[in-house]
Amino acid sequence: MLRFKELYQQKIIENLQKKFSYKNKHEIPQIKKIVINMGVGEATANSKVINNAVNDLTLISGQKPVVTLARKSIATFKLRENMKIGCKVTLRKDRMYDFLERLVIVALPRVKEFRGFSYKSFDGKGNFTFGLKEQIVFPEINYDKIDTIRGMDITIVTSAKTDQESKFLLSGFNLPFYN
């Protein structure tokens, strides 16, 4: 079994119950899914770039991503409707916990000048979104084989009703916060 899943089941649930005194076990917040999005702006000029982004995201997540398409045309960006502009992957269950573990233990310590996440990254409904500027912080990515350094947006969707509950939940997984 995964370490972070065991950590949630054995310690975090108990700590959440003590702090917020829930009446029902189904009220206890949990992580529902993790969405990783990689926007590829240069795909408008070169359509082969999207394949490299898909390969990178496949290595990082362990799951094949979905290619995202433009919803409408924007002339200033030389963008037409249904053009490939990025890729995303949604992780649930065991893959979600596996990714979260690799993110916290391996990837975040490799980010340059990383002090922690701001509490302002919560959306008011218990979800947490942050961005990484480089995909090379993940050990699965070979620096010599990438064409360009790309960033990504990572959203952690929780069942928490408030940001305070979500902060306490994610702090239990050792996500570093400052403020």
UniProtKB/Swiss-Prot annotation:
GO terms for biological process: translation. Gene3D superfamilies: 3.30.1440.10. NCBIfam families: PRK00010.1. Part of the 50S ribosomal subunit; part of the 5S rRNA/L5/L18/L25 subcomplex. Contacts the 5S rRNA and the P site tRNA. Forms a bridge to the 30S subunit in the 70S ribosome. Signal peptide: none annotated. Keywords: Ribonucleoprotein, Ribosomal protein, RNA-binding, rRNA-binding, tRNA-binding. This is Large ribosomal subunit protein uL5. It comes from Rickettsia rickettsii (strain Sheila Smith). One of its GO terms (cellular component) is ribonucleoprotein complex. InterPro entries: Ribosomal_uL5, Ribosomal_uL5_bac-type, Ribosomal_uL5_C, Ribosomal_uL5_CS, Ribosomal_uL5_dom_sf, Ribosomal_uL5_N. PANTHER family: 60S RIBOSOMAL PROTEIN L11-RELATED. One of its GO terms (molecular function) is tRNA binding. This is one of the proteins that bind and probably mediate the attachment of the 5S RNA into the large ribosomal subunit, where it forms part of the central protuberance. In the 70S ribosome it contacts protein S13 of the 30S subunit (bridge B1b), connecting the 2 subunits; this bridge is implicated in subunit movement. Contacts the P site tRNA; the 5S rRNA and some of its associated proteins might help stabilize positioning of ribosome-bound tRNAs. It holds the Pfam family Ribosomal_L5_C. Belongs to the universal ribosomal protein uL5 family.
